[in-house]
Amino acid sequence: DAMLVQDLLGERCEIETILFAIPTVDDENKRRILSICNKTKCNVRILQDIVQLIANGGKDVLSRVRDVRVEDVLGREQIELTDLTNTLVSGKVVMVTGGGGSIGSELCRQIAACGPKRLIIVDIYENSAYSVQQELKRRYGSALKLDVCIASVRDSKKVDRLFARYQPDVVFHAAAHKHVPLMEDAPEEAVKNNVFGTYNVALSADKYGVGRFVLISTDKAVNPTNVMGASKRLAEIYVQSLSIALSHGEVAGKTRFITTRFGNVLGSNGSVIPRFREQLEKGGPLTVTHPDIIRYFMTIPEACRLVLEASVMGQGNEIFVFDMGKPVKIADLARRMIELAGLVPGKDIQITYTGLRPGEKLYEELLATKENTLPTPNEKIFRAHVREYAYADIAAAISRLSDIAATVDRVATVREMKRLVPEFKSKNSLYEKLDKFQIIPKHDSNESFSHRRSRVHRLQSL
């Protein structure tokens, strides 16, 4: 009985701190126990790595005690890297674009731990890159050969120069614009960075004989309802088409192109959890866009471990999707975070609903309607079976899209994106009007000239 436990722990025994130290408990019971503990007035902490602690004779107990984190109540299991994953980067020259970001920086941490020959961090944001550089220098010192390059993936000449200089064996392409509402307002920037940036890095990877190129994608690329998701879907399509062209001998090269696709990560820059923490510190309210909005979550370290695992098993031309577990209602997440702070939702801290933002879905999908998956040796990783695209057509289409984006015409840019990604249907966005017209990508010989001219005029008037 939760009330009985709360009374016993909080008052009768005059307990001030509860230390959770049950390493074998399953996720459901862990959440239940922590939920009961958090309803008391006690300070709740977790003793981690208890088995290792016992093996070390009980030394350094305090260093293994930490506060309860939101991932503890979401029930995400820890994933350990295999020896095969270590061989992917051990003794290799590894480049990470977007290496200062949430995913990119964690990839750098895990790669550094595997002993690469050299690690190259590429990022346009010098503060983020500098922070990761200093962290890795403190941890590894001269044992890690580390280079930080301030560069934009949009700059094809600079990208080519970096590849020529470092000759990387493995490339993780994590550089991207990711904020949905901002990209609705600046679709040309999403195209330049997410689409053309991927084009630049992938072409250089092929040109300089990179062994493996790994694209970090998102579940928002599936049946996209916003510009950001559509731009990432185009990046997926380009990488996949290039890989197919290589396998068919249409393009010279040996690079294995692999895509990894997953949902939200806990605590990434600008995401919901840091925002909730900031709102809690200010006394609330916690803002949620819709009472029924749900998202899949995994921790950043877990996502990066799965990226590395998928990179090992990939042979080229795969899109790997990850087991994201059970979806979480954002409203429930808000309540859990309030409770973790020792407060009562609706009493101490309010939750308010602000309405869906432009391009925002109530739920995300990891697979499109006509996609299905195949199992892999890792039970948390699946291979998506997706449609194939002709490389020459896609390369020409991206070149045209880049030219349109350069005009800074938002509507024209999004119109072309919808032509290339027909499943892209805008939601809560000014671009919804574009979906009212059928966009015919090729000339229909049975269509009269006057009818075709009328159709084009209607589209151009939007």
Model-predicted regions and their roles:
Residues 84-88, 241-462:
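Strand-loop microenvironment adjacent to phosphate/nucleotide-handling motifs in alpha/beta enzyme folds
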Residues 3, 30-93, 206:
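Flexible, Lys/Arg-rich cytosolic regulatory linkers and terminal tails that connect or flank
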Residues 150-170:
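Conserved Rossmann-fold cofactor-binding substructure of NAD(P)-dependent oxidoreductases
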Residues 94-114:
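N-terminal Rossmann NAD(P)H-binding glycine-rich loop of SDR-like oxidoreductase domains
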Residues 31-47, 118-125, 165, 170, ...:
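NAD(P)-cofactor binding segment of oxidoreductase domains
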Residues 9-16, 116-117, 163, 167-172, ...:
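Proline-aspartate-enriched helix->loop->beta-strand connector
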Residues 1-43, 127-131, 138, 146-147, ...:
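A solvent-exposed beta-alpha-beta segment
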Residues 55-57, 173, 177-237, 241, ...:
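Conserved Rossmann-fold NAD(P)-dependent oxidoreductase catalytic core, especially the SDR/UDP-sugar
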